[in-house]
From Swiss-Prot:
InterPro entries: Cyclophilin-like_dom_sf, Cyclophilin-type_PPIase, Cyclophilin-type_PPIase_CS, Cyclophilin-type_PPIase_dom. One of its GO terms (molecular function) is cyclosporin A binding. Keywords: Cytoplasm, Cytoskeleton, Isomerase, Rotamase. This is Peptidyl-prolyl cis-trans isomerase cyp3. Its main location: cytoplasm. Belongs to the cyclophilin-type PPIase family. PPIase H subfamily. The lineage of its organism: Eukaryota, Fungi, Dikarya, Ascomycota, Taphrinomycotina.
Length: 173
């Protein structure tokens, strides 16, 4: 039995509950990256107003069929926001030990080297071209069908979904 944390996200599209995605975090390999994500799932980190910050009620703002689904920008909701549990806007790449070698991997979205924050993506295909550029830190262990349903959501400009794809609840199992 793994001692690595398992988190969940309950997903709804335009208010219609799809179901739950469960993700195992690779805390033994990338502990800082995994902990940053875990705390944003639980809401235990407080923002400047002393209210919990995190993924609850945030959206998947970028979907590219045959590649990945991206979310986690609870700051601005459009892919420009960043926050960490480390009292900084970003944090360095922890390591690139894990590869983007299969669908269902959780990886950090970034704006270049050492620019990790709160945004993440889940792969829907192997993406070896991301190796050495994005930190893999978890994998979907249940609810991959939900990931695929999100991936099939129609998108408009900038790969932005035409529907509201929201994380309506999240936490740690």
């Amino acid at each position: 039995m793994s001692t690595e944390p398992v988190v969940f996200m309950d997903i709804a599209i335009d208010g219609r509950l799809l179901g739950r995605i469960k993700i195992r975090l690779f805390s033994s390999i990338v502990p800082k990256t995994a902990e940053n994500f875990r705390q944003f799932c639980t809401g235990e980190t407080l923002g400047v107003n002393q209210k919990p910050i995190g993924y609850k009620n945030s959206t998947f703002h970028r979907i590219i069929q045959g590649f990945m689904i991206q979310g986690g920008d609870f700051v601005s909701g459009d892919g420009t926001g960043s926050a960490t549990i480390f009292n900084s806007r970003t944090f360095p790449d922890e390591n690139f030990t894990l590869k983007h070698d299969r669908p269902g991997l959780l990886s950090m979205a970034n704006a270049g080297k050492d620019s990790n924050g709160c945004q993440f993506f889940i792969t829907t295909v192997p993406c070896d071209f991301l190796d050495g550029k994005h930190v893999v830190f978890g994998e979907v262990i249940e609810g991959y069908d939900i990931v695929k349903e999100i991936e099939s959501t129609p998108v408009g400009a900038n790969s932005r979904p035409k529907s509201n794809v929201a994380i309506v609840e999240c936490g740690e199992m």
